[in-house]
Design a protein with these regions (language model features):
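Alpha/beta-hydrolase superfamily serine-hydrolase fold, recognizing
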Residues: 1-282
Length: 282
């Protein structure tokens, strides 16, 4: 069969760029410098349209991370009209908190400084992340301490306008350990650089729940009820704190879902995520 078909162009071309250096940081006992990188998916066409940006922050217990994880899923957001960025951050093997949130905020500032190049609407930024990345998503939304902004592009704001954390640790002072020795070796203590059982107040003050104010951006929190790694109550506590402060917040409790289960990658849930970002980021 021979057929002539006329196709109207209604969608832009989507460009994926990997390993963009957004910052250089000290490494190996401050004797060297290394690049921090991000991956980006953005639309490219002949118009001057700008698109909201969603920053993805992967998990890994703060001890390992791979910014390329889930890029195939993240492309779904790009096709819904968002610029999507997956950001590398330093792990607790390289340094303690707040190093990790400093990296995330540096990436946000870099993207805003290069908004024209990547077709970004710099006034409409969201963040989404899983587990350890969910913690950093919360802190990107809630921690406005100017001391967290270090490095380049300090003329740009690192603030975001919407947050979607998945199964996030939100109160590092309430994780349960059988004894101080187990606590000292925990991912939470390694992140903070001290034994949490012996520094409860400090751990609380380094947690998202301690940073909630009435000025928090909208939140969509997603957590599996059967999570055996980060208890569901962690998200409930953050949600309750947001509501107490009059903030815009929703909590989706996934029935039967454990930590990072396949339920988090089903179309039904992603439709809710896309709807959230479209409404909150315009």
């Amino acid at each position: 069969m021979k057929e002539k078909l006329k196709i109207n162009v209604t969608k832009p071309q989507y460009v994926q760029v990997s390993d963009i250096t957004y910052a250089q940081v000290d490494s190996w006992y401050d004797h060297c410098r290394r690049d921090l990188k991000l991956d980006l998916i953005y639309p490219e066409d002949m118009s001057d349209k700008r698109y909201p940006c969603i920053v993805w922050i992967c998990g890994g217990g703060w001890i390992r991370m791979d910014k390329s994880a889930h890029l195939s899923y993240l492309s779904t957001l790009a096709h819904q009209g968002f610029v999507v960025c997956s950001v590398e951050y330093r792990t607790s093997n390289e340094g303690c908190y707040p190093m990790q949130i400093e990296d995330v905020k540096a990436a946000i500032r870099y993207l805003k400084a290069h908004a024209d190049r990547y077709r970004i609407d710099k006034e409409h930024f969201g963040a989404m992340g899983e587990s350890a990345g969910g913690f950093l998503t919360c802190m990107a939304a809630l921690d406005h301490d100017k001391a967290r902004d270090v490095g380049e592009y300090l003329e740009e704001s690192s603030s975001i306008q919407a947050a979607c954390p998945w199964y996030p640790p939100t109160n590092l002072s309430t994780f349960k350990y059988k004894d101080a020795e187990e606590c000292a070796a925990s991912m939470e203590s390694l992140l903070l650089g001290y034994n949490i059982m012996r520094n409860i107040k400090e751990a609380y003050n380094s947690s998202p729940v301690s940073k909630v104010t009435k000025d928090a951006p909208p939140f969509l929190i997603i957590h599996g009820i059967n999570d055996q790694t980060v208890p569901f109550e962690q998200s409930e506590e953050l949600y309750d704190k947001l509501i107490e402060n009059g903030c815009d917040a929703d909590l989706i409790a996934l029935e039967g879902a454990d930590h990072a289960d396949l339920q988090f990658f089903q179309d039904e849930l992603w439709d809710r995520i896309i709807e959230f970002f479209k409404i909150k980021l315009g």
